[in-house]
């Protein structure tokens, strides 16, 4: 027993990305690993970070919220789980609108993402593969990832291992 309650009925703390930027006076409204460590110190082992401004993690197949953020900014439908002061789990809803995905592919990071791929693989090849991919029918879905070594570190910090 580590002095922790069982998970049933527990509400984990969480916060809106821009609210946390304001709280921790994050430069340029960008949270860093330093800010994640502050969340750990203040809120404990697990913290859900939500309502990311789209520009903080633009990705061409990430879905945008139909509702704008408090400052009128576009919001990505994603969340990060901060465990032990580290971003450990990331999840986001994926886009299912082919036209929007194509537009985002060409415009995210002011077109630099597409240009990087053109430089690495040849523009003709990249556009051919993009067209082939976008021919599929897309259903509402999500994707995510877990940093296993970070999760192990967080579990050790929490006394669970």
Regions found by a protein language model. Give the residues of each.
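A translation/RNA-centric and nucleic-acid-associated enzymatic feature enriched
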Residues: 2-161
